[in-house]
Amino acid sequence: MTAPTTGATAGTTAPAPVPVPAVEAESTADRLAWHLCGGCRTLLYGKRFLAANRVCPECGWHAPLTAPSRLAQLLDPGWSELATPVPADPDPLRFTDSAPYPDRVRQARERTGLAEAVVCARGRIDGAEVIVAAMDFRFLGGSLGSAVGEAITRAGELALAERTPLVIVTASGGARMQEGLLSLMQMAKTSQMLGRLDEAGVLTVALISDPTFGGVAASFATLCDVIVAEPGARLGFAGPRVIEQTIRQKLPPGFQTAEFLLNHGIVDMIVPRGDLRAALSRLLRVATGVHEVAEGATAEGATAGGGLSDGHDGAERVITEVLHLPVRHPWDAVRQARALGRPTTLDLISLLLDDFNELHGDRASADCPAMVAGLGRLGGVGLAVIGTQKGHTVAELSERNFGMPSPAGYRKAARVMRLAAKLGLPVVTFIDTAGAHPGVEAEERGQSVAIAENLRLMGALPVPVVAVVTGEGGSGGALALAVADRVLMCANAVYSVISPEGCASILWKDATAAPKAAEALRVDARQLLELGIVDGVVPEPDGGAAADPVHAAALVGAALRATLATLGLAGPEELVYRRWLRFRRFGAVAGEPAGASPPGRPGNSEHPGHSEHREQSS
């Protein structure tokens, strides 16, 4: 382990002893010892166990890490430890159980070599600057007391002052009972600190290790932008024993584990310990990259960033003239749009983006498999990508709910849009859905509300928003991802208020009249461009996107780069105002200007982003 350099914050007193010697001595002893795996109960030789970062090579069980070991694992060599604050009154309640509270703290310090249950540091992950606060369960169960809350808050305030991402590694049984309600106040204090980082647009990441419960789980552990969990890590407000003893409820297998929480929409990703550095590095590269218009970009988007090349010049990237599109029967487009070979959202992501970080869950109840969302880089530009996901086989379609999102899917999309607004990243959406998922459960969980909230949210995003209908654009379920500055459509895609079959059944009383309904609804790209519903059409390879998915993806990528370059020239207020004008004109009264700015121009309202956006808007 590389010993950290020491550093103190002005006005604080660095505690003794320094933690590094105790950790090194422990590691030397561990190397010669045998360890019993907490998962499969296999005996592991110390040298092999430590080489695997305390992960069982047989079953993958992740043993606890000390805070200094965690920092050494995550950070580049040369990181510096921040001073641990000392509360004015370390024993405010004069608390005694079987031993006085000060004696317990003293014993914990002697046993661990730490000043408190958290170690904070300044360092880098693959060169990207970060502030890290790592908790240590060995110190009074990692409990949240005044010193821990103050240390984490100060780490956050340093991240705020330096506009540096904050990473918090959690390991805690909850609030420190010996400090009473003063411990509980640390939940509020740290939560307010994270709120300030949200306002400032500073990325926050929580790394959940086992266990994380109580006041820590109900504050900073679950308020960060991205929640990463180690395999098997447990997270919850009330522990299993409390639940079983209080309400006598039988708990399901795997309850409160990372895997359980991923399925229930609480954590973004599960990352094995050996992959954590790479995962955090990838996330930092995207989230902290500066969004700039490509050098030489013009209002027409004649040049754009790198990425896949389509071999076409700028004029062919997006077709904006109706005369340049062939006349066709809309039913032909419907059949092409539904072809299973067309590139899906995940196909487009894999072909177009670098450093993609898929984010899961609505942070409330579920993770919808029909909606994919995350952060990545297109030609070096960081952005948020959100899209409905179908599949190429019946099995894949079934697994992805046939691309029909649940309320949790739309709420996941909204969460990632808000994150993009906070970080100042453009939003790109890919739409290929027959519509929002219907059914009892969807209605019980507020499908209408989830869609409506997305419409309102997208209208106020202070960043460029581009929507691409890549296949089917079905009704409000598609519109919930299409309130954008530019709405593009692939040449063989369709976009409609209802499926042709549904329209035919209702109005013609005959499902076989679907081709006639498609024609009446004008669902194809040419007619929707003529109506002004879409702003441009993305060409497809000969034979359609299914015939050459790689080329089709390249064409989409070229269209996106050109469009984002154009939108990047406008500020947040102008983007919001033009987006409002774009949708305000639909259904305007004849003879009245559809674009007249009413009192309280939309661009002047508060955006769901950070303070820098609001400053630019003033």
From Swiss-Prot:
Residues 317-566 form the CoA carboxyltransferase C-terminal domain. It comes from the Bacteria. Coiled coil: none annotated. This is Acetyl-coenzyme A carboxylase carboxyl transferase subunits beta/alpha. Its main location: cytoplasm. It comes from Frankia casuarinae (strain DSM 45818 / CECT 9043 / HFP020203 / CcI3). Acetyl-CoA carboxylase is a heterotetramer composed of biotin carboxyl carrier protein (AccB), biotin carboxylase (AccC) and two subunits of ACCase subunit beta/alpha. Its cofactor is Zn(2+). Residues 33-566 are annotated as: Carboxyltransferase. It holds the Pfam family Carboxyl_trans. It catalyses: N(6)-carboxybiotinyl-L-lysyl-[protein] + acetyl-CoA = N(6)-biotinyl-L-lysyl-[protein] + malonyl-CoA. The keyword Transit peptide does not apply. Residues 591-618 are annotated as: Disordered. Its EC number is 2.1.3.15. Binds 1 zinc ion per subunit. PROSITE patterns: COA_CT_CTER (PS50989), COA_CT_NTER (PS50980). Keywords: ATP-binding, Cytoplasm, Fatty acid biosynthesis, Fatty acid metabolism, Lipid biosynthesis, Lipid metabolism, Metal-binding, Nucleotide-binding, Transferase, Zinc, Zinc-finger. PANTHER family: ACETYL-COENZYME A CARBOXYLASE CARBOXYL TRANSFERASE SUBUNIT ALPHA, ACETYL-COENZYME A CARBOXYLASE CARBOXYL TRANSFERASE SUBUNIT ALPHA, CHLOROPLASTIC. Zn(2+) binds at residues 37, 40, 56, 59. GO terms for cellular component: acetyl-CoA carboxylase complex. Pathway: Lipid metabolism; malonyl-CoA biosynthesis; malonyl-CoA from acetyl-CoA: step 1/1. In the N-terminal section; belongs to the AccD/PCCB family. In the C-terminal section; belongs to the AccA family. It is found in: Cytoplasm. Component of the acetyl coenzyme A carboxylase (ACC) complex. Biotin carboxylase (BC) catalyzes the carboxylation of biotin on its carrier protein (BCCP) and then the CO(2) group is transferred by the transcarboxylase to acetyl-CoA to form malonyl-CoA. InterPro entries: AcCoA_carboxyl_beta (IPR034733), Acetyl_CoA_COase_a_su (IPR001095), Acetyl_CoA_COase_Trfase_b_su (IPR000438), ClpP/crotonase-like_dom_sf (IPR029045), COA_CT_C (IPR011763), COA_CT_N (IPR011762). GO terms for molecular function: acetyl-CoA carboxylase activity; ATP binding; carboxyl- or carbamoyltransferase activity; zinc ion binding.
